[in-house]
Each structure stands twice: as structure tokens, then as C-alpha cells.
């Protein structure tokens, strides 16, 4: 009995007799491994290689026959690896390593999924589902900045919507379709660009159900909005008024397919830490109970232990939670993080003010102790990075009002007294001498 020898790829093998297998000249598979085999002069090709060749030719012919301007082509997304995405985020967002890593992986997989749809076959058994993202963290920790920075890095349209403005259809407020209209505006009405954009829904915790008990009064801005968002989050063709606002019977609508739009929802979820601590206390025994007792101090850092059941208890319906499978939390910003935010990112606040002063021909310098005072005041206000801009704007507004009218100024030094409002900045002339001010 002799063994069949598989020929090398690229060489055809004809059957030596009835029932003997033949092999594909391209991939080397035998006729027993594939559904069908097409014979040619001294060559064979299997159905799998035919299908692959068809896909390649279809793409190449389409590109040749339909050359279009870049803006009108099916919108390509610049696919960046998760590691490269995170390295880019590091240049703009301080800290929040866990959230940045989770976002980078989720965004990479989302756009990889979109690309795969172009070459996947209809008979493919594995269908990759959409993975929208939920960001949980105290105010001012960078939720919006993370989403916006990702959109900028990927060069996709981006829009921000406040969930508190949304109501059910038929009630005063914005329909949920409004969020798609804003994305359409952000993409300059390029439908294909819009259908691959990112929408950030802020204050998502504010549409939590007000009570676990079913009420006879309608919750038009709570559970009702969650129900209305389900279809959009999952992926559906939605008719959108081009100018936003309410739909009217005779109004022309633009149909947007949301299956490839990435939704990132964010919220502070005030009080969620207590629910998490209570759950951990109930489930902990022995030594673990001591750990849970410490968590019962309701440190916002406990948010990293959040589970979907906690969000359900908070007031989000299970169907809504299920459409936001990627769950990540952000940590409160401490003194070190706030100090870094002031000076380290590419678009740091200090660098922005320095650029504005440079346009007036003046060098701006912040004394180290002045930065300490800005951070201390921001911590007292408890609104995270947002407080930094508020503190600085309050200090700098008078200086920026007077400076353009002052002559011979080469340098402006901000001191701790300047931040406290008990002293003026130090001005130096262009030759380095101290400038007297009235």
C-alpha cells in the first residue's frame, strides 16, 4: 500500500485514477478538504481560493473604476494599536492608566471590527458584537477629555451630548435622535464619516431610574430615556432631522446607521461607592471583611470594584447596561496629579497661557510656589481638573486685560501672592530689569 504525497504549492496534481484526490494548485488542499475543485489545463483551484481571489479583485476593481475624492470615499479610520493609542493618550491625559488601557483596547477592537466587515463572508459563524463603553468617575477626572482625545487621534467625527437634556418622544426636551444630528453636524454632513464617529454621552448617571419601585407617574427623563437609547446603542437605522430638534410628519429625515458608531457614556455616579461598599461588606468574610470595612468609608477609589449589578441597583436597567459592556472607572485626582496636569500634557494650561503671552511678545513664568497654591485651591473646590482652569482664569483675567497696554514688558512672573490675590505679578523689562507698576 503506497501513501499519497501532497505536491508542493503551485504544482498541479491530476488524479491517477477514479476516486483519487486532486490538489489545489494555490493552497495545496486536497479535494477531500474543500467543497469543490475547478479543473483547468494542468491546474486545479479550490472554492476557498476562488472566494479569496474574488474578494481581492472586487476591491481592486472598485478602486480603479470608482476613483473618488478622499472626503467622499468610504471613510477609512486610521487603525492604531492599543499600545500606540495609550502612548498618545499619555501625552494629553495625566494618570488614569487603567482607564486609558481599557479605552485603547476597546477602541482598537471596535474599529478592527468595522474593517473586518469589508472582507467577512456572510456564512462566517463568528460575528463580533459592538462594544460601547461606560466610564465612571468623579467630576473633573478626565472622562470627556479621554473620549475627545481618542477621536482626535483617530481623526473621526466627535460630538458631546448631555444626557440631562434628553427626554422621551412627545415630552419637552430633546429626542434621543438629537445626539445623532449633532454627530452629523460634526462630520459636515458626510454620512459615511458620521457612521464611524464617536459620541460621548455625559451625565449618564442622571438618567438612572429614580426609584427601584415601578411608579404610576412616567419617568420621562430617566428610565424612559434609557429605553429610547437602546436601539441607537445597539445599532439601527435611525431617521434624523438634519437640523436637529423634534421630528415632524412632513419633515425629510436623514437615515443614519448606528451599528458602527462608538458610544462612550460617562458619569460621576455619586453614591455608587456606597452601593459597592455595601455589596463588598456582605460578600466578605474573615480577613476580607476587614478590607470591606475600610471600603465602607466610601472612598471614591472603590469605584474600580464596580460591577454591572451595582449599576442596576443604582437605577440603570439591565438592557441598557448590557449595551455598554466595557466598564472602566477613573480615579480621583490627588495633589500630584493636579500639579502634573498643569504643566506636563502637550496642551497643559500653563503652556496655553504661555502661548497667549508669547503672542504679545511677553515671556510668562509661574514660580513653583504659585503652582502649589493653584493646586491647593483646586483641591478645596473638589471639582478635579476643572477647578484648575477656574482658579487660573480668575487670576489671569486682570493681568491679560492690562498687559497689552503696557510698554516695554519682556517677562511676567506669577507668584503665590498673585494667586492668593494679595500681590501683583513681577514684571521685567526686555533687558531684564524690574518694571515698576502703578
UniProtKB/Swiss-Prot annotation:
Protein's UniProt keywords contain Nucleotide-binding: yes
Domain of life of the organism encoding this protein: Bacteria
Binding-site residues, ATP: 138-145
Paired cysteines (S-S): none
GO molecular function: ATP binding; ATP hydrolysis activity; ATP-dependent protein folding chaperone; protein dimerization activity; unfolded protein binding; zinc ion binding
UniProt keyword annotations, A-Z: ATP-binding, Chaperone, Metal-binding, Nucleotide-binding, Zinc
Domain ClpX-type ZB residue range list: 11-65
GO biological process: cell division; proteolysis involved in protein catabolic process
InterPro entries: AAA+_ATPase (IPR003593), ATP-dep_Clp_protease_ClpX (IPR050052), ATPase_AAA_core (IPR003959), Clp_ATPase_C (IPR019489), Clp_protease_ATP-bd_su_ClpX (IPR004487), ClpX_bact (IPR046425), P-loop_NTPase (IPR027417), Znf_CppX_C4 (IPR010603)
Entry keyword annotation includes Electron transport: no
Xref: Pfam families: AAA_2, ClpB_D2-small, zf-C4_ClpX
Gene Ontology CC: HslUV protease complex
Residues that bind Zn(2+): 24, 27, 46, 49
SMART domains per the UniProt record, alphabetical: AAA, ClpB_D2-small, zf-C4_ClpX
Stated role: ATP-dependent specificity component of the Clp protease. It directs the protease to specific substrates. Can perform chaperone functions in the absence of ClpP.
Subunit comment: Component of the ClpX-ClpP complex. Forms a hexameric ring that, in the presence of ATP, binds to fourteen ClpP subunits assembled into a disk-like structure with a central cavity, resembling the structure of eukaryotic proteasomes.
Family: Belongs to the ClpX chaperone family.
Alphabetized HAMAP family for the sequence: ClpX
Protein name, entry field: ATP-dependent Clp protease ATP-binding subunit ClpX
Chain's gene name: clpX
